[in-house]
């Protein structure tokens, strides 16, 4: 079983997942279309405690939630070297749906930073190519603070945060090693690397998925540049994907919920409901959120 080989958390509500449509017959209780099972893919080095704050947005509304964060060494080193180790983890993650017999539930992904996007990239590939997973039904994806294109300085900032509690000598060694590897494989040997490994950002630009996407980012983000997210939004729109994007303007990397809890939660919940009712109007495209009072 995949569950025995993956460090994940699953939260299953007592009540079945239903969309928030008040029914007179039920005294205002939730009824109607089933809400999606939500899969949270955490940012590099984030703790389950931190990810649980996002999980609560969905779980308290009756959603099954799975949260998982890929090991930081795979994110920063394996992917940089072009080693697709995360593909194995992506497959185990999808196999959890069959282990818990929830593979027929609609799925919503909530993906954080480039670490989450790197894993999500392989999820997309498996959904398209793996016979067991091709019938899974994804209804939407939320991107928080990502995806970003090659930004060595931003990646170093992210890795420094991951390593902040490590001994100083080890931290310095790993930062130098990452810098050398990234520069070698993505600058000096970029044409050679491209022959056997496509960068996750480039893969997502032309992804075959067509379900709605919500991008939550900030021009104040020093890890993932706002222009990278905006370029992704334009590319997805060009592929006729229903996209909404919100610029939080002042919040730092993966800090939008912390700085604007009410507004962030409302955006996620409204997007989730629009995805499960995709036959109706889907969320419009926005480029910024000029008024944030949450």
UniProtKB/Swiss-Prot annotation:
Single biological process term from Gene Ontology: negative regulation of osteoblast differentiation
Keyword set, alphabetical order: Membrane, Nucleus, Transmembrane, Transmembrane helix
InterPro entries linked to this entry: AB_hydrolase_fold, DUF829_TMEM53
Transmembrane annotation, as ranges: 172-192
Role according to the record: Ensures normal bone formation, through the negative regulation of bone morphogenetic protein (BMP) signaling in osteoblast lineage cells by blocking cytoplasm-nucleus translocation of phosphorylated SMAD1/5/9 proteins.
Annotated family: Belongs to the TMEM53 family.
Name of the protein described by the UniProt record: Transmembrane protein 53
């Amino acid at each position: 079983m995949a569950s025995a080989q993956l460090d994940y958390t699953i939260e299953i509500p007592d009540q079945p997942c239903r969309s928030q449509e008040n029914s007179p017959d039920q005294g205002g209780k939730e009824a109607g279309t089933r809400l999606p099972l939500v899969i949270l893919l955490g940012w590099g080095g984030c703790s389950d405690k931190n990810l649980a704050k996002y999980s609560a947005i969905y779980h308290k509304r009756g959603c099954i939630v799975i949260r998982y964060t890929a090991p930081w060494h795979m994110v920063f080193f394996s992917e940089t070297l072009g080693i697709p180790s995360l593909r194995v983890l992506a497959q185990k993650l999808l196999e959890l749906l069959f282990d818990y017999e929830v593979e027929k539930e609609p799925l919503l992904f909530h993906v954080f930073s480039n670490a989450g996007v790197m894993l999500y990239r392989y999820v997309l590939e498996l959904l398209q190519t793996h016979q067991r997973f091709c019938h899974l039904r994804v209804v939407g994806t939320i991107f928080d603070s990502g995806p970003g294109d090659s930004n060595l300085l931003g990646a170093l900032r992210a890795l420094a945060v991951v390593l902040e509690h490590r001994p100083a000598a080890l931290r310095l060694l790993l930062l130098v090693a990452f810098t050398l590897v990234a520069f070698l494989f993505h600058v000096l040997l970029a044409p050679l690397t491209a022959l056997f490994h496509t960068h996750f950002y480039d893969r997502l630009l032309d992804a075959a998925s067509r379900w709605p996407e919500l991008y939550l980012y900030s021009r104040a983000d020093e890890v993932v540049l706002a222009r990278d997210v905006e370029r992704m939004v334009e590319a997805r729109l060009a592929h006729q994907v229903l996209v909404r994007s919100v610029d939080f303007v002042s919040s730092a990397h993966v800090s939008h919920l912390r700085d604007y809890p009410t507004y962030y939660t409302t955006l996620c919940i409204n997007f989730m409901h629009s995805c499960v009712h995709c036959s109706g109007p889907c969320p419009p495209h926005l480029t910024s959120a000029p008024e944030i009072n949450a």
